[in-house]
């Protein structure tokens, strides 16, 4: 039987005579060739019924079926059917549009409330509207657009307007036949569905069949909002599906749609907030951004004169503009609505409801108080408190369950009656969403959920869903972004004398000291070294402290932390960091990342008006100047991946320069890290901070240094006041010429550890360094030269240096093309008794087993060499056998041997086992990434269990072995308390000594 979704086509087939139907099938063969489709065999078509042919067409050609059929109707002289089908399809599409128009007209007028004429709103969103048209201007290519912006900036309102305009016939008419709008958080309680079911839920009864609708996916747009409130993780998945009919877990359906596995030719328009942006964008294909940057001054004016009568609106606007902090809040549409609503109530009650400087929490409180007074008047505070508490319980239960749409059972369970619901709707605390209820704005749910904890009493009934305050604080500060991300500011904002005083007339005494104590207690636990949980997003905390603004409490919180890592992405972030960090008197270590946008000198219209850009520049400069005051008191300043301009560098220099009131002896800075820094300047910064007597460590990894800047650096290092001992200049684009400059200056410096990894020094650069090493004044102890484009020729220079240098103990030559001939030269130097080298790193140097004879000779005669790393070389079993002979020699003193990734097999395990038992000094052996099997592992484990084995670290990836082998290793570890079997055992130490750092992201 034909599927009901395909009935639309069948009804036209029924109107064909048998002769016409037969002719239709014959022509179908040619039509398949015309459309370049894989043909259905004639045997399948010849005797098939009309019902079966419909099924076959939709199965094999779902996207071309109507184009083919309409064309074939013409060829069998049934133009009437072709015309009739087109008219009927168009009528059904228009009926869907009409249905959506009525629905979104109701949503626009009843639930959106922009409080301004459409022409004024259209002026406000003109830039975003043009961006939308530009993205979807193509007639055929699928596109993905994301509407971005902080909370309350009008993203959902913009999408609703776009949906209404499409349904009204004024937007993207030639581009999309169907536009579907879904608030994805409404699916939070749906565990399984199909895309077909999801679409069907939006279709009126008179619509086309799903097969017909989806037969042309390039003419379909999905509008999706509410990702911030979605409780599913829509991560990159491999278990995706392209079948829109198939029922799947809800997150799989959404992921399949977003990742273009399901209906890849459709287009997407998504609303993403702060929480969801970083999670969803990686799933999308070539997303283009539409930025909602908030209301301009002109837009605020439009809003005020529309919300109030014109004369009163003008007066309100003027008053708001005089109040700069309040006017700043007005750029957020939801905040402007609350402010105007409160002012309207104050106007009619002849009360001054908003003072000169109010926080977001205070604005919400004033709005709620105004609404309560207008409805409940002078009723008892006990009664009003009871009513408020039911609303707060609904809100907090929803937050913990990640529910934002409530049904009648949710209201009943939380003691909200029908009459209560009517009151809350009138007060604009709640709004109707279809057959359900939502909070009027998401921030109201966050506010009421937070207020629950202030109203909570010990005698209250236990609620199994609602977590404790410490649990909630853990969700906010120690875990990934979640549904509580935006609510956190209200905890700090309500916990102020001002807000509690505002609440008192309506709801009686409310204590906030207990909440503050809980916050302090929890944050203190995060700051302890032994605590497994850490402060993941300090920026969240900074904005909370700005919301609080009570100096004593803010200082009390910030003084809990000695180390903080923070990412600064815009001017607001910098202001929040400046406010909070200046109150952290116990702060010692600051890791600061400043993104390009913060100090950019080029205006990008995507991020707002030129006027706002200039204001941001002004405030960023002021905040940076203030923030830099604390640098002199830090022990560690990490400016990794910071984007600076010339003026910012000047401020940084000034902050680290001595003054009559701030002599050099007062500065505490010991470690400075400037990795991957842009616009580093001309090097004058070195002359400033290298004077600081406490500064011992400087890391510039990934920051490009010209020859002139290198010369400035070296000149400063040579200065008598400079005390730098560790200098890490990896990946700084230092040439062999710059290396020559450096070698000349470093001879008389105090530098003991020098890393030049990942620089194109070449053999010529090493020649200069070796001249430095041969100078008796050189005190260098560690030299890191991995990835420096060296060959065996460099080893000839190093040979001479090793013979004469009395201080060098660590030499890293990893990942250079040294070959056996180069290592043999080094071995000749190591055989001399006066060679002081203790560690030699040679991983990835293109060595073979041939060089192991010379290395073995070194191991048996050199008493100083304690560490030898030969990983990632073609040593093989034959080479290891020679090395093991040396390890068994009584004069071998090596303690640490790296043989990871050396193409070893079981054949060398017997030799290794003997060496483990015989060598009294060997403490660490790395065999990671070698193809050892169970039998070889058994031999090693037997040796590890031997009483003469001194090994305390074995490098192996336990997870790569069979279950039986893993059991063996676990048993050995259990028996030998001092033994650790580790994967990548030395990576952390190697990166630290090389000074290698990662480009900043939120995880490092």
UniProtKB/Swiss-Prot annotation:
GO cellular component, one term: cytoplasm
Name of this protein: NACHT, LRR and PYD domains-containing protein 9C
UniProt keyword list: ATP-binding, Cytoplasm, Immunity, Inflammatory response, Innate immunity, Leucine-rich repeat, Nucleotide-binding, Repeat
Keyword rRNA-binding assigned: no
LRR repeats: 750-770, 779-800, 807-828, 836-857, 864-884
PANTHER family per UniProt: NACHT, LRR AND PYD DOMAINS-CONTAINING PROTEIN 12, NACHT, LRR AND PYD DOMAINS-CONTAINING PROTEIN 9
GO MF annotation list: ATP binding
GO annotation (BP), single: innate immune response
UniProt main location, coarse: cytoplasm
Entry coiled-coil feature ranges: none
UniProt function note: May be involved in inflammation.
Keyword set includes ATP-binding: yes
Family (UniProt): Belongs to the NLRP family.
Free-text tissue specificity from the UniProt record: Oocyte specific.
């Amino acid at each position: 039987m034909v599927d009901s979704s395909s009935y639309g086509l069948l009804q036209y087939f029924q109107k064909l005579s048998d002769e016409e139907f037969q002719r239709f099938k014959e022509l179908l063969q040619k039509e398949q060739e015309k459309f370049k489709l894989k043909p259905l065999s004639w045997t399948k078509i010849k005797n098939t019924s009309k019902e079966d042919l419909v099924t076959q067409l939709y199965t094999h050609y779902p996207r071309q079926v109507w184009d083919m059929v309409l064309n074939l109707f013409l060829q069998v002289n049934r133009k009437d059917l072709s015309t009739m089908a087109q008219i009927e399809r168009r009528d059904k599409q228009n009926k869907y549009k009409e249905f959506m128009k009525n629905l979104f007209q109701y949503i626009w007028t009843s639930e959106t409330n922009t409080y301004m004429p459409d022409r004024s709103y259209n002026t406000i969103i003109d830039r975003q509207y043009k961006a939308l048209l530009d993205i979807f201007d193509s007639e055929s290519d699928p596109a993905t657009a994301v509407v971005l912006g902080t909370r309350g900036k009008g993203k959902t309102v913009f999408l609703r307007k776009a949906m209404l305009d499409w349904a009204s016939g004024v937007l993207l008419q030639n581009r999309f036949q169907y536009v579907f709008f879904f608030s994805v958080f409404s699916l939070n309680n749906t565990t399984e569905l199909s895309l077909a079911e999801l679409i069907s839920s939006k279709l009126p009864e008179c619509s086309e069949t799903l097969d017909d609708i989806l037969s042309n996916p390039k003419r379909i747009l999905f509008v999706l909002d509410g990702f911030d409130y979605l409780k599913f993780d829509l991560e990159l998945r491999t278990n995706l599906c392209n079948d829109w009919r198939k029922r799947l877990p809800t997150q799989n359906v959404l992921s399949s749609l977003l990742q273009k596995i399901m209906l890849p030719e459709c287009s997407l328009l998504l609303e993403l907030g702060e929480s969801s942006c970083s999670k969803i964008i990686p799933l999308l294909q070539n997303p283009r951004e539409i930025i909602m940057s908030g209301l301009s001054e002109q837009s605020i004016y439009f809003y005020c004169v529309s919300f109030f009568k014109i004369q009163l609106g003008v007066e309100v606007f003027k008053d708001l503009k005089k109040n700069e902090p309040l006017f700043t809040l007005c750029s957020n549409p939801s905040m402007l609505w609350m402010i105007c609503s409160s002012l309207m109530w104050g106007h009619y009650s002849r009360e001054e409801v908003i003072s000169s400087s109010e926080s977001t929490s205070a604005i919400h409180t004033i709005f709620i108080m105004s609404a309560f007074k207008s409805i409940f008047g002078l009723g008892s505070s006990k009664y009003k408190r009871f009513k408020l508490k039911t609303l707060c319980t609904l809100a907090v239960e929803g937050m913990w369950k990640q529910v934002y749409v409530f049904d009648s059972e949710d209201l009943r369970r939380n003691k909200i009656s029908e009459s209560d619901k009517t009151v809350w709707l009138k007060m604009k605390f709640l709004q109707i969403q279809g057959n359900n209820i939502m909070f009027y704005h998401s921030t109201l749910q966050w506010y009421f959920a937070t207020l629950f904890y202030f109203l909570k009493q010990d005698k209250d009934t236990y609620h199994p869903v609602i977590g404790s305050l410490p649990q909630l604080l853990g969700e906010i500060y120690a875990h990934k972004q979640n549904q509580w991300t935006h609510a956190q500011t209200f905890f700090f904002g309500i916990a102020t004398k001002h807000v509690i005083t505002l609440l008192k007339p309506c709801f009686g005494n409310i204590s906030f000291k207990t909440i503050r104590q809980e916050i302090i207690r929890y944050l203190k636990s995060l700051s302890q070294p032994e605590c497994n949980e850490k402060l993941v997003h300090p920026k969240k905390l900074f904005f909370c402290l700005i919301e609080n603004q009570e100096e004593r409490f803010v200082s009390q919180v910030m003084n809990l932390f000695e180390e903080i890592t923070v990412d600064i992405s815009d001017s607001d972030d910098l202001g929040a960091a400046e406010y909070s960090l200046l109150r952290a008197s116990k702060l010692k270590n600051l890791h600061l990342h400043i993104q390009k946008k913060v100090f950019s000198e080029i205006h990008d219209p995507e991020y707002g008006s030129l006027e706002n850009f200039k204001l941001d520049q002004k405030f960023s400069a002021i905040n940076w100047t203030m923030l830099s005051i604390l640098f002199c008191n830090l022990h560690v300043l990490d400016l990794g991946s910071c984007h600076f301009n010339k003026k910012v560098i000047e401020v940084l220099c000034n902050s680290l320069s001595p003054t009559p009131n701030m002599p050099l002896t007062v500065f505490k800075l010991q470690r400075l890290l400037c990795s991957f820094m842009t616009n580093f300047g001309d090097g004058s910064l070195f002359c400033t901070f290298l004077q600081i007597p406490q500064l011992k460590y400087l890391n510039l990894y990934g920051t490009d240094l010209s020859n002139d800047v290198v010369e400035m650096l070296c000149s400063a290092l040579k200065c008598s006041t400079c005390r730098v001992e560790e200098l890490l200049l990896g990946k700084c684009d230092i040439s062999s010429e710059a290396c020559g400059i450096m070698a000349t200056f470093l001879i008389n410096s105090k530098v003991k550890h020098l890393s030049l990894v990942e620089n194109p020094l070449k053999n010529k650069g090493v020649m200069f360094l070796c001249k430095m090493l041969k100078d008796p004044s050189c005190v260098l102890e560690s030299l890191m030269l991995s990835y420096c484009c060296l060959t065996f020729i460099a080893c000839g220079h190093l040979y001479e240096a090793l013979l004469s240098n009395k201080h060098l103990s660590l030499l890293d030559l990893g990942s250079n093309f040294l070959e056996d001939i180069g290592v043999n030269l080094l071995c000749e130097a190591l055989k001399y008794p006066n060679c002081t080298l203790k560690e030699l790193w040679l991983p990835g140097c293109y060595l073979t087993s041939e060089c192991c004879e010379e290395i073995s000779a070194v191991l048996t005669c050199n008493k100083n060499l304690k560490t030898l790393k030969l990983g990632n070389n073609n040593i093989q079993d034959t080479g290891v056998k020679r090395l093991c002979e040396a390890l068994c020699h009584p004069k071998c003193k090596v303690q640490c041997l790296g043989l990871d990734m050396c193409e070893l097999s079981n054949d060398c395990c017997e030799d290794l086992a003997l060496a483990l038992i015989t060598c009294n000094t060997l403490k660490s052996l790395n065999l990671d990434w070698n193809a050892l099997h169970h039998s070889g592992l058994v031999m090693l484990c037997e040796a590890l269990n031997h009483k003469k084995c001194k090994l305390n670290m074995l490098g192996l990836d336990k997870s790569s072995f069979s279950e039986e082998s893993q059991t063996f290793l676990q048993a050995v570890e259990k028996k030998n308390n001092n033994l650790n079997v580790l994967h990548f055992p030395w990576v952390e130490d190697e990166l630290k000594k090389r000074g290698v750092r990662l480009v900043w992201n939120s995880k490092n």
